Amino acid sequence: MAVATQSLEELSINAIRFLAVDAIEKAKSGHPGLPMGAAPMAFVLWNRFMRYNPKNPKWFNRDRFVLSAGHGSMLQYALLYLTGYDSVSIEDIKQFRQWESKTPGHPENFMTAGVEVTTGPLGQGIANGVGLAIAEAHLAAKFNKPDAKIVDHYTYVILGDGCNMEGVSGEAASFAGHLGLGKLIALYDDNHISIDGSTDVAFTEDVSKRFESYGWHVIHVKDGNTDLEAIHKAIEEAKAVTDKPTMIKVTTIIGYGSPNKSNTAGVHGAALGGDEVALTRQNLGWSHDPFVVPEDVLNYTRKAVERGAGYESDWNKTYADYKAKYPQEAAEFERYLSGKLADGWDKVLPSYTPEDKGLPTRKHSETCLNKLAAVLPELIGGSADLTHSNLTEIKGKGDFQKGQYQNPNIHFGVREHGMGAICNGIALHGSGLIPYGATFLIFSDYMRAPIRLSALSQAGSIWVMTHDSIGQGEDGPTHQPIETLASLRAIPNLTVIRPADGNETSGAYKVAIERAKNNAPTLLAFTRQNVPNLAGTSIDDVAKGGYIVVDTDGTPDLILIGTGSELSLCVTAAEKLKAEGKKVRVVSLAAWDLFDAQDAAYKESVLPKAVTKRLAVEAASSFGWHKYIGSEGDAVTIDRFGASAPGGVCLEKFGFSVDNVLAKAKQLLG
C-alpha cells in the first residue's frame, strides 16, 4: 500500500502503530501486538466519538477511557501524544519504560495526565470502568435536572482476551449488566492470541453469549483491522442503547502489519526486532524515520484540541445556566468536585466512656457510617453480600439499583474482587465520591489486587473489614484471619487501622475520611465480638497510630502494646500488675504506619528505647511485631490456623486471656 493512497485517518492509525513499535524497539521491552491490532478501534473512538479536552485532562464531564489490557500502554501514550496532551511528548515516548518516565510499562494515573486508572493486572480495568460508570450514573441521578444535564459522559474500555479470562472481569461485567449501566461501552480486542499461543489452548467459550447472559448488548465487528465504518457504526449503535452496557467484539489481528509475526504469540510481549520493523514499515507503507509523525497527520489528530475546548466551553455554559437556576445544588456539586468536606463533619463522630455499653467495633462502625452519611452524602458503597454482618447499610437511603442510581447502598453480591476494583473506579472518577467496600477480613484475600492497586494508584477507597480474628468463632479456620493483617500492613500507602473500642472506631473513620479526600486508601479491621469502652482511648490520637492509653509514674518497668479487641486485655492486666507494685504502661498501636510516620521524639515518648521489656498482644500473626517489641520483648499472638468453636472459647484456648497476658508479663519482669 503506497502512502499516497492512505487517508489521514489511515495515516493516523499507522502513526499509532509505529510510535508503539519504535518505542518498544528502543526500550527493547514491551507489547507491540495490541497497539498494532487495536489502533483502528482506538482511533475511531478517540477521533470520532470521545469527548475530552487535551488541554484540561481533568475537565469534569469528559468521557473516561480505560485501557484494561494495560500491557498495550503504548496505544494510550500514542493517542495522548497525537491528540495534543501536554503530558506525553515525543521525548516521553522515547523514554518508554525508563526510570522516572511519564510512559511507564503499564498505564499509571498518577504518572501520566490523561490516564484515568492504573491498569496492568488483567481484568482490573474493565472492573474500574464499571466503577467509573457507577459514579457517573450516581452523580447524574443526584444532580441533573430535566432542563440541565451537567453529568453526562460515557466510560469506554478496551479489554482483551486475557481480561475476559480473568474472574474479576466476569464479576464486574455481571454486576454492570444487572445494574443496566447504559453509558458503559467496552471494546473487546478479539485477537485470539495470548502469551502461550492461540487462545484455543485454554479459552474457547462464546464470549458474546456470556456477555449477553450478563445483560449486555453485544455487537460484532468482524474486521477490526480495516473496516473503520463498521467500528463507527458499532459505537454509534452502542450509544443508542441506553438501558444496558454494550460490549463490542472487534475481531483483529494481533501485530497487524508485521509480515512474519502478526497473528502469533511472538508479537504479544516482545520487540519486533530491527529486520521485522523494517519489513513492517514497508508492508504498511510507512516511510518515516522512528518517532517521526508527518506534520499533516499531527495537524489532523490535534484537531482534538479545538474540539475539546468546544466541548468544555459548551459544558461551561450548561453549568452556568444550572448554577443560576439551582444555586443550592450547584454549591453542593462544587463541594464534591473540590474535595472539600462539609463544615464540622467530624463533630458527628460519637465518643464513649467506660460506662457506655460494650459493643463489637463493627457495631460502632455502623454508627459512624450512618452519622457520617448524614453530613457526607458523597459516601457510597456496600458489602459483598454480608451487609447485615458487616453492618454497612446507610439506613433510610435506599439501594443503588437500575433506575435508582441516586441511592448510596450498593449490593455488590458475592463478588469481593469485583467490588474492590469497582470501588477504585468510583474513587478515581475524580468527583469527590468516597467509596467503601466491605467483607470479612479473611476475604480481603479475594480482593488483594484492588486493595494493593488502591494504594498504588492513590484511590481514596475505604475497606471495611469485620470479623477480624479467631474471635470470629464457629465458622472455623477458613474464616479466621491469622496472617492477613501482617500481609495488609506490608502494602505501601495503605493504612490499616484496628480500633479497640468506640472512641478508636470514631478516630479510625476520621482518619479514613481525611485520607480518602487526600487520595489514599484505608483498611479498617473490626471485631465480631463485644469489646468494652476503655478509659484512656482517644478519637484524635488514632491519627498518630500509637499512643499511651494507661501510664505510670516515672519510667515503666514494662510496656504492654495492644490493638483491637486485645487492648482491653492489656488494660486489665496492667491494673492487676499495678496492684502488685509494678509500673506498667499500656500503648494502643492501632495503625502501625501512622505511628512510624511520627517524629522520633514522639515515638520515643511512647516507646522509650530504655524500656526493653515489652509485650505485644494481638490475635493475629506475630509477623512484624518484633519491630516494636525488640529482641528482649515477647508477644501473645497466634502463628497457627484457628479452630471451629465459639469465639470466646477460641480466644481463651489460644491464650488471649488476662491470665495468659499476666503470665507472659511476669516472665518478662522476672
UniProtKB/Swiss-Prot annotation:
Binding site for Mg(2+): D161, N191, I193
EC annotation from Swiss-Prot or TrEMBL: 2.2.1.1
One example GO MF annotation: transketolase activity
Record: residues binding thiamine diphosphate: H71, G120, P121, L122, G162, N191, H268, F443
Co-factor remark: Binds 1 Mg(2+) ion per subunit. Can also utilize other divalent metal cations, such as Ca(2+), Mn(2+) and Co(2+). Binds 1 thiamine pyrophosphate per subunit.
Top class in the EC scheme: transferase
Pfam families assigned: Transket_pyr, Transketolase_C_1, Transketolase_N
GO cellular component, one term: cytosol
Subunit note: Homodimer.
Function: Catalyzes the transfer of a two-carbon ketol group from a ketose donor to an aldose acceptor, via a covalent intermediate with the cofactor thiamine pyrophosphate.
Annotated family: Belongs to the transketolase family.
Name the record gives this protein: Transketolase
Organism: Nostoc sp. (strain PCC 7120 / SAG 25.82 / UTEX 2576)
Upper lineage: Bacteria, Bacillati, Cyanobacteriota, Cyanophyceae, Nostocales
